[in-house]
């Protein structure tokens, strides 16, 4: 299969189950919503070494938020609900409560699983906190130096999916990077997914385990490293490819990840110099979800 003259390899992305909390952060301006969302999702690229995977899903206009202010939806992802609640408390408490003019609302109010994160955060008020209603939602007002920090009582979570992905092969580092940026920008317009790596892009895609250093649980995926393609048996790098980037996608459900992969690939192949689109899988050893590239189109 080819799209815009770019080969779409007949392969699939392998993904795995993960627990996802969705939080809406609002602020007086989009800038401050983005600042708080960025801080709250820091150190959240991969559960290989990070305590959670996290990212900004999309921005919200004032017309769609409970308090009528600009906002940002974020997702925080862990393997277990217990760890997820801990991450919510730490990230909201340290990165959103401390940010100017922010408020926190439940991004999954209808989900079965709910954490009383707001109830716990209210104790920062040391007895001076109060209960209120905003757009029919139970919130707590916590007095702080600038006024009140508002947080909804509960934050919802669901069983989601992590590790949807595709690889972008370019004839140069800049062509591959430009295509990866275009892919991330396209995905950012959609609802339900995040791209948790720096700027949404993975420069150092890994394989599970190691060939030599057995004490590591993840190491460089040498078959996708252009600088050593002449040294690696069964390299996946064609002769005319000099850079590869991976886009990793977490999402609330399969449909959201499929839509994000499709939009990202369609954006990437419009960039001159892109030679091929592929995906990463581990023969079923990593996860139960398979997103076949050809079936996206």
Curated annotation (Swiss-Prot):
Primary location group: cytoplasm
GO BP field: methanogenesis, from carbon dioxide; one-carbon metabolic process
Compartment(s) where it occurs, according to its Swiss-Prot or TrEMBL record: Cytoplasm
Enzyme class: transferase
Pfam families to which the protein is assigned, alphabetical: FTR (PF01913), FTR_C (PF02741)
Database matches in InterPro entries: ForMFR_H4MPT_ForTrfase, ForMFR_H4MPT_ForTrfase_C, ForMFR_H4MPT_ForTrfase_fd-like, ForMFR_H4MPT_ForTrfase_N
GO CC term, one of those recorded: cytoplasm
Swiss-Prot/TrEMBL keywords: Acyltransferase, Cytoplasm, Methanogenesis, One-carbon metabolism, Transferase
Pathway assigned in UniProt: One-carbon metabolism; methanogenesis from CO(2); 5,10-methenyl-5,6,7,8-tetrahydromethanopterin from CO(2): step 2/3
Annotated Gene3D superfamilies: 3.30.70.520
GO MF annotation list: formylmethanofuran-tetrahydromethanopterin N-formyltransferase activity
Top-rank taxon: Archaea
E.C. numbers: 2.3.1.101
Function: Catalyzes the reversible transfer of a formyl group from formylmethanofuran (formyl-MFR) to tetrahydromethanopterin (H(4)MPT) to produce 5-formyl tetrahydromethanopterin (5-formyl-H(4)MPT) and methanofuran (MFR).
HAMAP family in the cross-refs: FTR (MF_00579)
Family recorded in the similarity comment: Belongs to the FTR family.
Subunit relationships: Homotetramer.
Name used for this protein in its record: Formylmethanofuran--tetrahydromethanopterin formyltransferase
Protein species of origin: Methanosarcina mazei (strain ATCC BAA-159 / DSM 3647 / Goe1 / Go1 / JCM 11833 / OCM 88)
Organism placement in taxonomy: Archaea, Methanobacteriati, Methanobacteriota, Stenosarchaea group, Methanomicrobia
